[in-house]
Amino acid sequence: MRHQLRIPLLSKPADQRKALLRGLTTQLIREGRVTTTKARAKALRNEAERMISLAKDGSLASRRRAIGYIYDKKLVHSLFEKAQERYGDRKGGYTRIVRTVSRKGDNAQMAIIELV
């Protein structure tokens, strides 16, 4: 039964879903914005905000957790350097989801997720 699901399943097995979200999170932190489907953007928001909260904490344990999740180690170091000055006064809401036009091939709802 699907009682109290906290993450959307995205029609993928658990390992593929985790790899997809890790890749999207890495791309979002690197580029600052990602165009994807609306469901993936909503799932990505949770992971990206968790990584930015770890970076704001700045402890060695949170740095190691971020290195274990984000694919690029240099990207983790730059995130930890910039997060405190960029998001120091914010308590959350580090991302913004903007809906765009539907995808041409299958009419899927698309969205742009970007860092605030």
UniProtKB/Swiss-Prot annotation:
It comes from the Bacteria. One of its GO terms (cellular component) is cytosolic large ribosomal subunit. Keywords: Ribonucleoprotein, Ribosomal protein. One of its GO terms (biological process) is translation. The keyword Acetylation does not apply. It holds the Pfam family Ribosomal_L17. Signal peptide: none annotated. GO terms for molecular function: structural constituent of ribosome. Part of the 50S ribosomal subunit. Contacts protein L32. Belongs to the bacterial ribosomal protein bL17 family. This is Large ribosomal subunit protein bL17. It comes from Prochlorococcus marinus (strain MIT 9312). The gene is rplQ.
